[in-house]
Design a protein with these regions (language model features):
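Conserved helicase motor core of SF1/SF2 NTP-dependent helicases
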Residues: 29-157, 161-261
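Interdomain "pre-motor" coupling segment immediately N-terminal to P-loop NTPase/helicase cores
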Residues: 1-21
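Polar/charged, Gly/Pro-rich intrinsically disordered segments
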Residues: 25-26
Length: 261
């Protein structure tokens, strides 16, 4: 790390525009380099550089959102964009905003806390507060994006598997000039009612051959949390596969019985 970067961190200021270095995205507030640690994290870094819209798909703990936010912070620090916009659909685990206590900020914050946590790792507290107060960094639920054109920005939609088909189309068509989007999601964690199609699932199918759009698939090998998390994910994958096979077997038996009648 350069002497200039260390001085900036001690003073609570941002490091100056980041010089290219292998695998480095940015330095965190503690001076620790934030890099693409796994092959798929590195693919996300490359995809972001080459495309205006990137889908990052995979399990919890694989670093897809953290790396996406680091890329946005780097673009802001290097003055490639003027703002960062982070969003999530405000429906998770069966909860809706209308049923949460408190005023709007109190209702929204629990959904957006993971995004705050990542930013706090990357931007000194005083500077982050300034960015938030001046709307250089904006964090809002997806519904707040309607009617806006998002230019000169990096825009990240997290937990996109919980968008409806209308919501994700609305979000993707907000893209303005000199802007890039990263859409993250985990197809195995859809919390929408069973009758609703995930907007992310539909969008991936519709946009798979569109120029300027990339798709990066993460997997359990990318999980960078506690090593137990990877084993938990593997156990659930095995369980889900058993359930899927049992369901297929039952359907096959029912079809055979109908054929005999």
């Amino acid at each position: 790390m350069s002497e200039e970067v260390i001085i900036d961190i001690i003073k609570g200021d941002e490091p100056q525009a980041i010089k290219p270095q292998e695998n480095l995205i940015i330095y965190g507030v503690n001076g620790k380099p934030i890099t693409g640690r796994t092959p798929n994290q590195k693919k996300l870094v490359e995809a972001f550089a080459k495309n205006d819209l990137t889908f990052a798909l995979g399990p919890a703990g694989s670093g897809k959102t953290y790396v996406a936010i680091a890329l946005a912070v780097k673009a802001l620090k290097n003055k490639e964009v003027k703002k960062i916009i982070l969003s999530r659909p405000a429906v998770e685990a069966g909860e809706k905003l209308g049923f949460l206590p408190g005023d709007m900020k109190d209702k929204i914050d629990p959904y957006l806390q993971p995004l705050y946590d990542a930013l706090q790792d990357m931007i000194p507290a005083v500077k982050l507060k300034e960015y938030m107060e001046t709307n250089v960094i904006q964090i809002a639920p997806l519904a707040f994006m309607r009617g806006r054109t998002l230019s000169d920005a990096v825009i990240i939609l997290d937990e996109a598997q919980n968008t409806t088909t209308h919501q994700i189309k609305m979000f993707l068509t907000r893209l303005g000039m000199n802007a890039k989007m990263i859409v993250t999601g985990d197809m195995t964690q859809i919390d929408l009612p069973a009758s609703q199609t995930s907007g992310l699932v539909q969008a991936i199918g519709i946009l798979k051959n569109v120029e300027g759009i990339a798709r990066v698939e993460f997997n359990k090998k990318d999980i960078v949390r506690h090593k137990l998390v990877q084993r938990i994910v593997e156990a659930y994958e095995k369980h889900d596969e058993k359930v899927r096979k049992a369901s297929m077997s039952k359907k096959h038996e029912q079809a055979e019985k109908k054929g005999e009648e």
